[in-house]
Amino acid sequence: MQEAIILLALLGAMSGGEALHLILLPATGNVAENSPPGTSVHKFSVKLSASLSPVIPGFPQIVNSNPLTEAFRVNWLSGTYFEVVTTGMEQLDFETGPNIFDLQIYVKDEVGVTDLQVLTVQVTDVNEPPQFQGNLAEGLHLYIVERANPGFIYQVEAFDPEDTSRNIPLSYFLISPPKSFRMSANGTLFSTTELDFEAGHRSFHLIVEVRDSGGLKASTELQVNIVNLNDEVPRFTSPTRVYTVLEELSPGTIVANITAEDPDDEGFPSHLLYSITTVSKYFMINQLTGTIQVAQRIDRDAGELRQNPTISLEVLVKDRPYGGQENRIQITFIVEDVNDNPATCQKFTFSIMVPERTAKGTLLLDLNKFCFDDDSEAPNNRFNFTMPSGVGSGSRFLQDPAGSGKIVLIGDLDYENPSNLAAGNKYTVIIQVQDVAPPYYKNNVYVYILTSPENEFPLIFDRPSYVFDVSERRPARTRVGQVRATDKDLPQSSLLYSISTGGASLQYPNVFWINPKTGELQLVTKVDCETTPIYILRIQATNNEDTSSVTVTVNILEENDEKPICTPNSYFLALPVDLKVGTNIQNFKLTCTDLDSSPRSFRYSIGPGNVNNHFTFSPNAGSNVTRLLLTSRFDYAGGFDKIWDYKLLVYVTDDNLMSDRKKAEALVETGTVTLSIKVIPHPTTIITTTPRPRVTYQVLRKNVYSPSAWYVPFVITLGSILLLGLLVYLVVLLAKAIHRHCPCKTGKNKEPLTKKGETKTAERDVVVETIQMNTIFDGEAIDPVTGETYEFNSKTGARKWKDPLTQMPKWKESSHQGAAPRRVTAGEGMGSLRSANWEEDELSGKAWAEDAGLGSRNEGGKLGNPKNRNPAFMNRAYPKPHPGK
């Protein structure tokens, strides 16, 4: 345990010894305000880490500061000693700026060990001398009218950064003060005596000194001028009345000096006051000296000065600011033009598209239309153009005449020329436009000339026509061939291929498809040589400028792709079991055709179903017509044969080697025929009346659906749907009619009207019921079956025919036992009564009695009174005598 503690202590000591340290940091340093650059603020050193790796150059450095400043940097002294100094990039002002700066100093050695410490810099206040503000710092002219009462003249004010901020007053003094002036401690200038101009007191030069609490001082000059009072008009002494000035003179430039003198103050013209009475924005005059200066920029080339370069001024001179004597004079300034505007152009970059077949000598660009010089007078407003320059432009373009700015084509711009292609058919012409007068201002004009290609060469195919062969067995998307068109014009534009005419069949509008980009011709569907052996296409190639077409002939190569087709394709045959061998069964003949094979190329064979090989075809090869023969007898008695119904699948192949072909081709097609053969056994019962056995031939006809007759099932289906809809509609109408005319529900009152009787021929009993009917019929309707009109009772539902028919004939009653009455159920209506069949009594001569009990039934099912029977019902339901009775 003790060893572990010692080991941890050693590791801690080693890790601490490996650290990189900034010595004498963190710390606080002081620097005086307004210190010059390079002033030392604080010195420190770097203790290297245990690896003794040196500090990376550029470190230590100040990585951050609060507040942010660039007023300090770290300088290397020697070895591992450094110091923080001022940079002079920012003014350190105790009164106006921050007083304390926290600088983060970062150091890093070559192995990556780092340290970061903070240096706090305090800006210390320094006593600064006081300062005069404004014009007072440069000296000031003061004017006092002669004979003015002694007293206040001027209040002098100065500023001291330290004392002013602490409200400590400054002390003002006059150095070597004359006896006529005195200054108070607060800076007030007083005159002590009345000043007389004529006595020689014309001006006084005073030096004012100000001192702060620290004894620092500053001084300025005061020129006190005594203004003379006089009654003489000042006289101008300057002889010049017209002045010439150049444009673009700097403001403040003296362009004229107007002088005058006052007889009252002879020899002291500076006491006069000058002014310009004319409104002018270009000139100003010193009111004391009479010097005229430029007030603002004078541009000879703009505004009214471009047309009239003269400026007239009226100068006023007077001997006192207010009142007194004055005089006026007219002076004129003529503004002369200087070459201050370079030749310029509306634009300095031109892009010209020139067709490649442009003739030599063609004017491409006239720069005179775009370039100008704003100077107003010659030669300042004149300019010319230098020789054109630019890679590859010297042999193609020229300025003609020289210096005219007219660029003329002198070379060849053929787009397909190799040298022009190497240049990219793009040319840069650089021309300088410059003044002809000093200082020869110039500007570069860049002219980019691009050659536009023209359609010089036609679009042609690499062959005048194309012939392609394709097998008729090839599937869709098979490549037939490829056409290619070229255009020698550059740049190459994309070509689009299309089939303009041809390539159609009876079933397909387009048998071929061409790739619009590559010109590859492909099949859209399989082709048939027997239908169309040759296709002639017109293929068109188009680019942006031209169109060309070529004829393409596609030969369809014939191959054995058609199956033999035989008639009939299926058939039903019947033969007696004892048919003679070699007999043509039912004279059956098979006729076959093949569109791509000769009649001698057929070979016939019977596949599954020919059990015991009873059947064969003759001939079995070399002919398109063959017959079905019986090759061996049937043996059902011996058990050799057991099948009576044969299903033969006949194969018809077009590879007969006995035909005119020397060998079988690679492609062989096989057709099939289905035969159904029924063997008729010997009859089990011998009919003596039949002199000889007969064979009944049964012909089986089978309807086979053909896709071309699609309309037949469609019409049948549509007609069935319409008929079914019509029947449903009629049933709905009938149901509505029954519901409308049968609103009542009546009870049943069934009574048998006759006794049951039996006869020899009677098979069933018929009970005739009658319905009691209301004699009041208040409605009429038409019977939907017969179309006749009947009357009905709206309450009971009873009905009767409106127009009675002929009454039933009355039969003499012979017996009531022969009547076999038929029961009319309650659900039957008029139609049931009308359609009832009555059986006649077997006894001859007897007939139904007049009141045989035939009645009618209303809709409620009640039996009616026989007295109210409708004669029409009786007429329709009388018994019929049996034939032969």
UniProtKB/Swiss-Prot annotation:
A single Pfam family it belongs to is: Cadherin
Q: Where is this protein localized, as stated in its record?
A: Cell membrane
Annotated transmembrane regions: 714-734
Q: How does it sit in the membrane?
A: Single-pass type I membrane protein
The UniProt entry's GO biological process terms, in alphabetical order, are: adherens junction organization; calcium-dependent cell-cell adhesion via plasma membrane cell adhesion molecules; cell migration; cell morphogenesis; cell-cell adhesion mediated by cadherin; cell-cell junction assembly; homophilic cell adhesion via plasma membrane adhesion molecules
Signal peptide as annotated in the record: 1-19
The disease this record links to the protein is: Asthma susceptibility may be associated with variants affecting the gene represented in this entry in early childhood asthma with severe exacerbations occurring between 2 and 6 years of age.
Entry function: Cadherins are calcium-dependent cell adhesion proteins. They preferentially interact with themselves in a homophilic manner in connecting cells; cadherins may thus contribute to the sorting of heterogeneous cell types.
Quaternary form?
(Microbial infection) Interacts (via N-terminus) with human rhinovirus C capsid proteins VP1, VP2 and VP3.
Recorded protein name is: Cadherin-related family member 3
Q: Specify the species.
A: Homo sapiens
